[in-house]
Amino acid sequence: MEASSSGITNGKNKVFHAEGGLDLQSHQLDMQILPDGPKSDVDFSEILNAIQEMAKDVNILFDELEAVNSPCKDDDSLLHPGNLTSTSEDTSRLEAGGETVRERNKSNGLYFRDGKCRIDYILVYRKSNPQTEKREVFERNIRAEGLQMEKESSLINSDIIFVKLHAPWEVLGRYAEQMNVRMPFRRKIYYLPRRYKFMSRIDKQISRFRRWLPKKPMRLDKETLPDLEENDCYTAPFSQQRIHHFIIHNKDTFFNNATRSRIVHHILQRIKYEEGKNKIGLNRLLTNGSYEAAFPLHEGSYRSKNSIKTHGAVNHRHLLYECWASWGVWYKYQPLDLVRRYFGEKIGLYFAWLGWYTGMLFPAAFIGLFVFLYGVTTLDHCQVSKEVCQATDIIMCPVCDKYCPFMRLSDSCVYAKVTHLFDNGATVFFAVFMAVWATVFLEFWKRRRAVIAYDWDLIDWEEEEEEIRPQFEAKYSKKERMNPISGKPEPYQAFTDKCSRLIVSASGIFFMICVVIAAVFGIVIYRVVTVSTFAAFKWALIRNNSQVATTGTAVCINFCIIMLLNVLYEKVALLLTNLEQPRTESEWENSFTLKMFLFQFVNLNSSTFYIAFFLGRFTGHPGAYLRLINRWRLEECHPSGCLIDLCMQMGIIMVLKQTWNNFMELGYPLIQNWWTRRKVRQEHGTERKINFPQWEKDYNLQPMNAYGLFDEYLEMILQFGFTTIFVAAFPLAPLLALLNNIIEIRLDAYKFVTQWRRPLASRAKDIGIWYGILEGIGILSVITNAFVIAITSDFIPRLVYAYKYGPCAGQGEAGQKCMVGYVNASLSVFRISDFENRSEPESDGSEFSGTPLKYCRYRDYRDPPHSLAPYGYTLQFWHVLAARLAFIIVFEHLVFCIKHLISYLIPDLPKDLRDRMRREKYLIQEMMYEAELERLQKERKERKKNGKAHHNEWP
């Protein structure tokens, strides 16, 4: 039995030929080993043990991979499980039902009229369009390339013409070789698994233990959905000369539908439509309006009358809907291999990254929830909250001019307790944890991406030399230089021209950032003016909570401004990017991505930065307030601190923005598609349901966003920034992000499967420029969290008081008993008679004690009015300031060291993956040698059989 032509399958004593049929020699060998009747006295277990012992002494060329042990499945085998080989009975049955299959193919709208040629691509145009000559030349050249074509008119509008394209096997093979499409490679060497007694015992004990464990609920049910099982195969670039090396069960399904569409699109991008070196490609025809749309077809309906568990999947779209896009599987893992097979590697990588990000949010959300619950459980023991709630004799100065009244410090008891929920002893730990978490997330994503790239054959994939954008060619067609790669002349942009355009673009970016700052300034003016208005409001609820009402309404107005400016920013970013005249589409995409991210990041976080680092920091003090344009007094923090304002800002913005994004992602396409169907029914003049072919159904769906996955990535990257940058002030941000992402995955899946036309299956090795942006956000989050803890929260002032000024000063303790008297020490005294005329409140405070007040308190570390330097900074202020600066420096250096250490310790490529890659390279070479040797041996046998002479070999 030769290793090069047979293999053992599933540990049984059957040997199958590499072509898939039963090998004759192996069958004869079985007959020799298994004599008839009573003569059988051979111990087969001893024979197998002997074979295994011999295998240990030779160089076994395959490791213990079950996937390598069986042939790969093609598209159809995923939907119709069973033997990959067909018997003569199966063939006759298929031939008898051939006419029925062809009729069914014609009716489902996925094939030509003959029911044999599958539609690989659709072009749409209107007969009334004047670009007739260009289309005719283009379509004539399409036929010259070997593609088959058919045209159909729309059922509801005869002006709309659908051009159906089909690529025959010869065309697919020729261009697959040019594009280096990797396909399953034929296995030539059988594998005998090594078995060690010790490992076998361990496996047996583990299997017994697993029987008592519940099934993993998040894993996809492979028993009821066997179609999800797809064997892994070694692949190699397709070659027509070595076509016999590849596993080809059916030429019609050897290239899956996504690959076929990608090959056809590749052909269309290189076909001329006019004479001239630049008059080439489908994209230019779509730009000038010659064609309205171009897209590959969905594989039929995503719904079925029968259950997928009992009748199986009707098509891959139905399979994806049931096991991925349906809300009933929200808690299960994503079938990423199926997503990649249907939508391509680029979209598959997006969902892989989104799933990885969502999974990594679980520990962050758990720790954040723990920090919040820790604040809840320690609320009754918090000395600061107790003192605030019991401070009925401490009267606070008004927080605004004229209309704001004096108030007891105890009136802010609720806000002090809420502040403790987010600003407690666990906050610093959580900030350090999140900084480390961001690094671990990125480092392990690199490892995860490497595994995915290996499984999806992206390790050695390199992007093709990109075509020059038509706009770039039109602008610089007069200046040319030789391309160092292709050796062909191409348009050239002078360095001075490029620099001048970049300067203008940078000026535009700076101007738009100034617009954001102006919007924030407007919000500040609104807060300053409104707090006085709410303080004089008739309703007691609003009057007594004027600051909270001001913050809440300001956040809502800020959200509306953010959404309006986003529309403006997109147009400005588009204008500035086109002004730069990028040479290729990838350069254009990277430039546009950076601008949009910068605009939206500043737009979304500018108000948050103001509240975190500026609100209440530069207000002055009673009697000497700082004012805007010498009129409006700057807003002060609440008596319980500014952190409550920051929490409200983050919570409201995060919830509103995620809700709006989810509506725009799913609700808006649903409404658009419903309106399109309604319009079609009205134009057709009937309310009855029309049975449209698949190409017309897909044409009525919404096209994918013009910027591809840009909006999907941008939404998640902004959320990542919101989750990490100010997480010290809002520990529940990871939990909100987790809940949103669980919904986001299914929303995006539902949108791709049901609401959008099928996008072209594109390849990509990683998430592109977004990874660098994520790294930048991770660095920024360390800095901002250090400042939030040191400046925005009261963590440092409490720490200084406990060690320096409290009852435990000098004892090295910092418990709750050491915080006695902290509230009184953090408040300064102001003499009411020192108020400015325009700041003096209408009330004299007699409602508190029956007599006019002489003094009130305010948050600051200043000397009393009767001291030698009235209202000057105290020594405690300078101690707190020094401690804040020291904390920022120590925190940043410590966290950055931890981040770099983690980055150094975690390799980008897992060791087992590195070994698998090296072994695969070796195995592919061995299989190529074995396959070539087998081919030569077959040719030699054929020559001998036919009696043809051949040259003698050297001895």
UniProtKB/Swiss-Prot annotation:
GO terms for molecular function: phospholipid scramblase activity; protein dimerization activity. Residues 374-424, 527-547, 617-715, 790-885 are extracellular. Predominantly expressed in neuronal tissues. Expressed at low levels in ovary, uterus, heart and brain. GO terms for cellular component: plasma membrane. It is a multi-pass membrane protein. It catalyses: a 1,2-diacyl-sn-glycero-3-phospho-L-serine(in) = a 1,2-diacyl-sn-glycero-3-phospho-L-serine(out); a beta-D-galactosyl-(1<->1')-N-acylsphing-4-enine(out) = a beta-D-galactosyl-(1<->1')-N-acylsphing-4-enine(in); a 1,2-diacyl-sn-glycero-3-phosphocholine(in) = a 1,2-diacyl-sn-glycero-3-phosphocholine(out). GO terms for biological process: calcium activated galactosylceramide scrambling; calcium activated phosphatidylcholine scrambling; calcium activated phosphatidylserine scrambling; chloride transmembrane transport; establishment of localization in cell. Its main location: membrane. Pfam families: Anoct_dimer, Anoctamin. Residues 1-352, 446-505, 569-595, 737-768, 907-955 are cytoplasmic. The chain crosses the membrane at residues 353-373, 425-445, 506-526, 548-568, 596-616, 716-736, 769-789, 886-906. InterPro entries: Anoct_dimer (IPR032394), Anoctamin (IPR007632), Anoctamin_TM (IPR049452). It is found in: Cell membrane. Glycans are attached at residues 544, 824, 837. Residues 73-97 are annotated as: Disordered. Keywords: Cell membrane, Glycoprotein, Lipid transport, Membrane, Transmembrane, Transmembrane helix, Transport. The term 'anoctamin' was coined because these channels are anion selective and have eight (OCT) transmembrane segments. There is some dissatisfaction in the field with the Ano nomenclature because it is not certain that all the members of this family are anion channels or have the 8-transmembrane topology. Belongs to the anoctamin family. Has calcium-dependent phospholipid scramblase activity; scrambles phosphatidylserine, phosphatidylcholine and galactosylceramide. Does not exhibit calcium-activated chloride channel (CaCC) activity. This is Anoctamin-4.
